[in-house]
Regions:
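Phosphate/nucleotide-binding beta-alpha loop and adjacent structural elements of enzyme active sites
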Residues: 1-143
Length: 143
């Protein structure tokens, strides 16, 4: 935290997910994957299951309950659109600067930029590739 000059008193870790609806989400972790990716659905019968967990899922609007934000960074492995749908009121009201990953699905760049522009027409966009290889595109949004 010190490296990024972040005030630790303003950071909290929450064991929950963010999406367009509140509820619970089941994740299955398989031990044949060295990265232990969580899966929303159980893998096929041939895969050895290492762990299953159920986690709370919130909308960002409900979690923040009207508290202001100035910056939103999201690299949530393809769940960027559901996260943004659950943050609609927060984005409209506070117009935070945003750094949104747009490389998980081919349609991400267009759909995410279009959705953000629908919410706040004043948003401007910058696209940056952070890795030397193709991919890892981040869409920066600011008013």
């Amino acid at each position: 935290m010190q490296e990024w000059a972040i005030d630790e008193s303003k950071v909290s870790l929450v064991k929950a997910g963010l999406s367009s609806e509140q509820g619970r989400m089941n994740c299955t972790f398989v031990n044949d994957d060295p990265l232990r990716h969580g899966l929303a659905e159980a893998p096929d019968e041939a895969t050895e299951i290492d762990e299953r967990i159920s986690s709370a899922v919130w909308t960002l609007d409900a979690y923040l309950a009207g508290k202001p934000i100035t910056f939103l960074k999201a690299d949530v492995e393809g769940m960027e659109m559901p996260l943004l749908r659950g943050a609609e009121e927060t984005i409209k009201k506070y117009k935070p600067k945003m750094a949104l990953c747009v490389y998980h699905y081919p349609s991400d760049l267009y759909e995410i930029a279009e959705y953000v522009r629908q919410l706040v027409p004043e948003y401007q966009f910058r696209l940056r590739q952070h890795a030397p290889l193709f991919g890892d595109f981040v869409l920066y949004c600011h008013v």
